[in-house]
Design a protein with these regions (language model features):
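Residues marking helix boundaries in flexible regions
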Residues: 5-8, 80, 196, 514
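Feature marking well-ordered beta-strand scaffolds used for ligand recognition
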Residues: 217, 221-224, 264-271, 281-705
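Generic N-terminal simple sequence motifs
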Residues: 16-17, 31, 79, 467, ...
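Bacterial Sec-dependent N-terminal signal peptides
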Residues: 1-22
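Extracytoplasmic soluble-region selector
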Residues: 20-321
Length: 705
């Protein structure tokens, strides 16, 4: 066993606001005080743009100050708090700035061996008066017999978009055109009307001209007559005039109806043998696409100008179900397991296979495994460092250099440790790198002689390890948005994909080789490579991004669909609902499929979400998603074809498995952290019980009683 240090202390708080549930330590509490008067604050009132200072102390039940560091966070994109970490005396003088209105929170959190201590100060920020309304891409020429939707943006005097306002739409001449309650304007007759959007005491108006409708019929066809659940159908509809001329400016609406069937029913003469109580469920879009969630006979309808046309489609079960069979399991019962990595041996160990797993809220250990015989995997070496948590572990492409992250070091030097893993039976420490990383390194990645390391949840630093014994920083990437925070970074083909909570995914050129669109291989084209070529590890250049409206962006993985000419980034959530009166939290969230085929206009088209559990990390191989789902175990999902709607409801889940172990740190409960497909098997790390290897096998035929 190799050691750097052995003294253990409180866990660094870099990633605490997104960690697994643990017990509350009620022996300690946070006190929020006025920095000059030193009286206790029950709340704080600020206007947008204003700042105030708050003194935060961590004390025991007798009011004595506890000398340890803790983390401070403002509500994302609403409150900025600086600094984000206290000093070692257990005190922080924090400058708080309000960016949004509402009943907000300034939060503090510390983690110790007895559990976590949390505290919050209410920050009340009043609403700013509204200033203006603007129509979004308004249509001013409309046609009788059609319906047009209007939307607006509402701005306040702080120049911010105000959401969740009650905007009322009215028409000055309802005989010409009339609004419903949802911003849809129905055109009744030719003429002019002034439409007005009103909220509170401000409004905006627009003159709309209603013209005679030249439409005389609608032509409608669909791309397929029989599909599986989850397959996207293209709806081809055109409006024609009396001379069969196509009218491009006449709106078309699409709808569906249908009858669901049992998964095992047979179709007879295009009718199911028995209907069920389930609805014929699916998703239809107004740009002409449909996908079904349940098998059945569906009627798809295109309507415009009083004309309609329909087509029927048969939807059959997707039938991708398999099962996961255990190949091997290495139990870790004394500490919690964090992430994993697997790789092929090199040199004298060529032909063998190895894995490394980290540890969470433990003693700073990383375990190295021989998995050459997956059924008999075993720990062959251990590295121990000064840390409570070794959250992340990575191995270089050539299988010779490893890196492990550190959080909770006793000397507050929470950097990273560089390892020689050429001989996994005798792993040695090459060096450690702590420069400006003392706030804790939560996640790391190795790509082409560089380590990408998260620094205190603020940015990722890029560290050259061409000589692993002498690492040095060459660059960094940090967002400039207020209160920004980062959780993870992944690098592939010289493009870095970082996950930044509410700021979403950022795509950065760190050495991508520029690729010509003309020379691209069909179905294997990353459009960001067409933009790359100017960035490097020392000069990272942003290529694109997409915000996360829910603020839960925890991980990201690029996905070049093998079955379509589309490029997605699959972003993963991590968030949890508090249970009133309990230290436990209910994890929620899933994986969002963002179509970046047009890098300037990314669109989320699909989601995979298991209703009762929450997501963690994921991996893609081919057209298959492998997902770690905390208490939901490991999930394997078919992501072939165009992706749209609710993938879970569409029957795309191939298999799931819960690795329950009576000898785990929490007996008989799974808590899957990370997952990697490798050489026909699927390896995953379970927080509660160690390392697993499973494989997909066909479902056994059902017998009879």
């Amino acid at each position: 066993m190799k050691k750097i240090y052995s003294i253990l202390f409180l866990l660094s708080l870099t990633g605490l606001f997104g960690q697994p549930p643990r017990s509350l330590n009620t022996d300690l509490e946070f006190v929020f005080e006025h920095p000059l008067l030193l009286h206790r604050l029950d709340s704080l009132s600020l206007n947008i743009g204003e700042e105030a200072s708050v003194l935060i102390r961590l004390v025991d039940s007798k009011g004595n100050q506890v000398k340890t560091t803790f983390m401070i966070r403002g509500q994302r994109k609403a409150i900025v708090a600086e600094p984000r970490r206290s000093d070692t005396t257990g005190v922080a003088k924090v400058t708080v700035k309000a960016l949004d209105s509402g009943e907000l929170n300034l939060r503090a959190m510390a983690i110790g061996k007895k559990g976590r201590t949390v505290g919050a100060l209410k920050v009340n920020v009043p609403l700013v008066p509204l200033e203006k309304i603007t129509f979004v891409a308004p249509i001013q020429k409309v046609f009788v017999g059609t319906s047009v939707n209007y939307s607006v943006k509402v701005f306040d005097k702080a120049k911010r978009i105000r959401r969740n306002t009650n905007v009322v739409f009215t028409s000055s001449n309802n005989k010409v055109a009339e609004f419903d309650n949802f911003g849809n304007l129905t055109i009744n007759k030719t003429g002019k009307t002034t439409i007005t959007a009103t909220v509170d005491d401000i409004d905006e108006s627009l003159v709309v001209s209603a013209k005679k409708n030249p439409a005389r019929k609608i032509k409608f066809d669909i791309s397929e007559n029989q599909v599986r659940t989850g397959d996207v159908i293209k709806l081809n509809a055109t409006v024609l005039d009396g001379r069969d001329k196509v009218l491009d400016n006449i709106p078309i609406t699409f709808s569906y109806s249908g009858q669901a069937i049992h998964q095992t029913d047979n179709f007879i003469n295009n009718r199911s043998t028995e209907s069920v109580g389930l609805p014929a469920s699916g998703l239809i879009t107004q740009n002409g696409k449909f996908v079904a969630e349940t098998p059945g006979i569906y009627t798809l309808t295109a309507q415009s100008s009083g004309f309609s046309a329909s087509k029927k489609v048969k939807v059959v079960p997707r039938n991708v179900r398999k099962r996961l069979e255990v190949v091997g399991h290495g139990t870790i019962s004394n500490v919690n397991t964090s992430d994993l990595w697997v790789w092929p041996g090199v040199g004298k160990h060529k032909g063998k296979d190895f894995a490394v797993t980290g540890t969470h809220s433990a003693d700073g250990e990383a375990y190295f495994w021989d998995i050459s015989d997956p059924a008999n995997m075993e720990i062959i070496d251990t590295i121990k460092v000064d840390a409570r948590t070794v959250n992340d572990v990575k191995i270089s492409e050539d299988g010779r250099v490893g890196v492990i992250s550190r959080e909770g070091a006793s000397n507050r030097k929470n950097g990273l440790v560089i390892l020689d893993v050429t001989d996994p039976f005798n792993v040695s420490i090459i060096n450690e790198y702590n420069d400006d990383l003392t706030g804790g390194v939560h996640n790391v990645f190795i790509y082409e002689d560089h380590i990408y390391a998260l620094s205190a949840g603020r940015r990722y630093d890029i560290i050259n390890i061409s000589d692993p014994a002498n690492p040095f920083r060459v660059g960094s990437y940090e967002l400039n948005s207020p209160g920004h925070s980062i959780h993870d970074v992944w690098v592939e083909n010289g493009i870095a994909y970082s996950s930044n909570w509410s700021d979403g995914v950022h795509v950065v050129d760190v050495g991508g080789i520029k690729q010509s669109e003309k020379s691209r291989a069909k179905n294997q084209f990353n459009p960001f490579l067409a933009l790359a070529g100017k960035g490097s590890p020392g000069n990272p250049i942003k290529l694109g991004s997409k915000e996360d409206p829910n603020g839960h962006n925890h991980a990201a993985f690029p996905f070049q669909s093998e079955s379509t000419n589309k490029f997605y980034i699959i972003t993963g959530d991590e968030w949890a609902k508090a249970v009133p009166g309990s230290p436990e939290r209910i994890f929620q969230g899933g994986f969002h499929f963002v179509d970046f085929t047009d890098v300037k206009n990314p669109v989320e088209t699909a989601i995979y979400q298991v209703p009762e559990v929450g997501s963690h990390n994921h991996w893609v191989k081919g057209d298959t998603l492998f997902a770690g789902y905390y208490y939901g175990g490991i999930r394997v999902v078919d992501i072939s074809g165009e992706l749209m709607g609710n993938l879970y409801a569409q029957g795309r889940e191939i298999a799931f498995f819960k690795g329950e172990d009576p000898n785990g740190t929490t007996p008989n409960i799974t808590n899957v952290w990370g997952v990697i497909p490798y050489k026909g098997l699927i390896y995953f790390a379970d927080l509660n019980n160690g390392l697993w290897a499973v494989r997909l096998v066909d479902n056994a035929p059902l017998g009879t009683n």
